[in-house]
Regions:
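Short sequence/structural elements of tandem HEAT/ARM alpha-solenoid repeats
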Residues: 130-133, 184, 252-253
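Internal amphipathic alpha-helical repeat/solenoid segments
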Residues: 122-149, 169
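Generic alpha-helical secondary structure signal
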Residues: 133-137, 155, 159, 228, ...
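Active-site-adjacent "gating/activation" loops or surface patches in catalytic cores
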Residues: 133, 149-168, 198
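Divalent metal-dependent phosphate-bond-processing catalytic cores, especially two-metal-ion Mg2+/Mn2+ enzymes
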Residues: 1-39, 43-112, 116-123, 151, ...
Length: 397
């Protein structure tokens, strides 16, 4: 009976989502026209002509693409920023000459993307107690704490931040989700998105536990990577006094929300998170249809511009909705435009293979997904894996 109820709830939510998508699709794409040819045609970092476009890309205002699903390409922007930083004019007779300097480990893509997202939503005006300079300092330090695995890098974090923004405000209209969430909660969500993989070693939780890594021992084999990300995030938030201007109760609430958000990105929670969200969302829809309103369980995160059941503050567990937004953004890159999605697929495959190399070197069983020796045609294997991920994880979510 419970399975039948869950299935029915899922059907109700899916039908509602489909109806909304049909009515909003035209508006979304009308407002999503490419505003910059350079960004609209961002080349893959592997293309030979990337250097020819790097300076134009680096000079382009990020605001032109920050709210567009098609135009935003974190990989191309990161490549452009690194190339621009790595070229310095030579002060001699040859005015056209340049000298190459080592590419910087930090391009600034995460800081710039997150600040652009916050500014696009007007968060610094809505929450004046949070100072932009403190946030900028936090993000700069945060980006430096990201390691450089192929996939779980600061570039991925920037991609997730922009995906969160697009989910919150796809049309720029009053009907957007962002208007149903308190600005303090939106701040917490974007901070969590920016920090959700900080310090990721390119090795999954199972590997760290199976090899008795010190990090696994520290976090008792529970969401090892995610607990590490949260620890770094909270330490940097305190160091840079990001929430110092908020009342104590709201400061604690923001930190608790960030904690739950980052821990929810552990893929081990995927199935339970989706099931819980469908259940809570269906109940909220039912309560709204019955005119009940659902009650306000959100404390100081309450937002009083809306009284209908779609207002997140009216949900029994409003933070669950934020967790679901972050999770959707975290797994969304296969749904990016083809050239971008293909590069993300290549990167995650290489990260898996490098873990497989570590597994083989440590004498532990090599997971099939991580075994580069068994992959055969890597491109075909990557395509098959990405297609399966889309079918069984991304699309149902």
């Amino acid at each position: 009976a419970r399975l039948a109820a869950v299935a029915y709830d899922a059907l109700v939510v899916r039908r509602a989502a489909t109806a909304f998508a049909r009515t909003s699709k035209k508006t979304r794409f009308e407002q999503e026209r490419p505003s910059s040819p350079a960004l609209a045609q961002s080349p893959s970092p592997s293309k030979k002509n990337v250097n020819a476009l790097c300076f134009d890309l680096a000079r382009t205002d990020l605001g032109n693409a920050i709210c567009s699903w098609r135009d935003f390409d974190a990989i191309a922007l990161d490549t452009a920023m690194r190339a621009a930083i790595g070229k310095e004019p030579i002060a001699d007779a040859d005015a056209d000459a340049t000298k190459e300097t080592p590419a910087p480990r930090v391009s600034g893509i995460l800081q710039k993307t997150t600040l652009a997202a916050m500014e696009h939503l007007g968060l610094f005006e809505k929450v004046p107690a949070i100072k932009k300079q403190n946030v900028a300092n936090f993000l700069k330090a945060l980006e430096k704490q990201y390691a450089s695995p192929e996939y779980h890098s600061a570039v991925h974090a920037a991609d997730v931040v922009q995906a969160v923004l697009f989910i919150l405000a796809p049309t720029g209209l009053e009907s957007d989700l962002v208007h149903r969430i308190d600005p303090n909660a939106v701040f917490a969500l974007l901070i969590a998105a920016s920090a959700h993989d900080v310090g990721h070693p390119g090795l999954n939780n199972a590997f760290l536990c199976n090899t008795e890594d010190p990090r696994a021992a520290r976090w008792n084999d529970v969401s090892v990577n995610e607990n590490g990300h949260l620890h770094v995030c909270l330490s940097l938030l305190k160091e840079h006094k990001v929430f110092d201007g908020l009342p104590e109760n709201l400061r604690k609430q923001c930190k608790a929300t960030i904690g739950r958000l980052i821990l929810s990105t552990d893929m081990a929670h995927h199935t339970r998170l989706v099931e819980e969200f469908v259940d809570v969302a269906a109940n909220a829809i039912e309560a709204a249809n019955l005119g009940g309103g659902g009650g306000n369980y959100c404390g100081s995160f309450a937002h009083h511009n809306r009284d209908d059941g779609s207002r997140i503050a009216n949900w029994k567990d409003p933070t669950l909705a934020l967790c679901f937004v972050l999770h959707c953004a975290d797994i969304s890159n296969p749904a990016r435009p083809w050239s971008t999605a293909r590069e993300w697929g290549r990167r995650v495959t290489e990260e898996f293979h490098k873990q497989g190399d570590c597994e083989r070197a440590r004498g532990v069983p090599v997971a099939a997904l991580n075994d580069r020796n068994a992959s055969g045609d890597v491109d075909k294997t990557t395509a098959a894996n990405q297609a399966a991920f889309l079918e069984y994880v991304v699309e149902p979510t």
